[in-house]
């Protein structure tokens, strides 16, 4: 036995490095946008979740400054003690209006919203069925709940139905967990099919709208609106930190669900309330989402333009080639790579060409990939330069 109780950490880190899984932070200087300063280099930003370009919007900045001047920098306590402000309820009402639900509840982060909500809804006598590619917060929330957790194959509604048929009757409650837009693939859950299956088996459904809110749907309400399912009873969780350009998370649903979570959700009860600045910025962002649909239109035009470029690349047209463009109906485009080393090589080549596009490697994803995030503020020239840089990087890797 090793004499030092922490000695294993260094060995574990070396294993990570040998597998090409090692990660480190990259410093962005200045305000976020379609172009940013990355470690002193001016680059095109295809790495951000700021899909509508609102994180640097002057209206959000002014709202945050005004709230800070009026209410201070911190909320100073939990919502049930000293942390509640009328601004929080204004944001919750705005989220409920956007999501077309009866009420909403704001959390300090989207990750915390998932952990806390899942733990409040199910326990050791219950069953969770989870898409195998769900976000870490859904997976971790399921694990911590104490419920029996079974994964179903990615987007496989037949597989989900089979698990329900086999296992549902053995448990008190059943909760289905799924992202609506999958963050590392860009594909979208077939929500009408899922709801039809789960309704037949008396199962609750929790959807994570993190990458759909502000992006999908006629008014930007997300994938639930996109699929025409706003009249269905389900639990919608999301974040304020992506298309809405702020920080925090939310749960939207029925009034009784939200009232229950205020009383039974540890991730909301026992944590400090969202800061006034973040709350005000998110509230301003929702107003922009509802009043400026052209941002979503431009975003989807950018996505379609880049998709068309990538689909025409010879390196991505071979059925069994080393590189593959994954199917996507969102602002996220992923190019699958054969291995972590190749992914790093392509990512470095893009960075040298002035393109910031992250490579995602195991264990975050099952296979290495280049993950591209499009923004409404990308110009046609930005998208064209991205296509040229990817063409060159893939050709260099093949040679």
Curated annotation (Swiss-Prot):
Coiled coil regions in record: none
Pathway terms, separated by semicolons: Cofactor biosynthesis; biotin biosynthesis
Chain sites annotated for binding pyridoxal 5'-phosphate: 110-111, 183, 208-211, 239-242
E.C. numbers: 2.3.1.47
Cofactor(s) needed by this chain: pyridoxal 5'-phosphate
SUPFAM superfamilies attached to this UniProt entry: PLP-dependent transferases
Keyword Transferase: yes
Any Pfam family matching the protein: Aminotran_1_2
Substrates-to-products reaction catalysed: 6-carboxyhexanoyl-[ACP] + L-alanine + H(+) = (8S)-8-amino-7-oxononanoate + holo-[ACP] + CO2
Any one GO molecular-function label of the UniProt entry: 8-amino-7-oxononanoate synthase activity
Positions of modified residues (N6-(pyridoxal phosphate)lysine): 242
Statement: the UniProt record of this protein carries the keyword Transferase: yes
Keywords: Biotin biosynthesis, Pyridoxal phosphate, Transferase
Binding site for substrate: 23, 135, 364
GO biological process: biotin biosynthetic process
Superkingdom, natural source: Bacteria
UniProt function note: Catalyzes the decarboxylative condensation of pimeloyl-[acyl-carrier protein] and L-alanine to produce 8-amino-7-oxononanoate (AON), [acyl-carrier protein], and carbon dioxide.
Subunit structure comment from the entry: Homodimer.
Family: Belongs to the class-II pyridoxal-phosphate-dependent aminotransferase family. BioF subfamily.
Protein name: Putative 8-amino-7-oxononanoate synthase
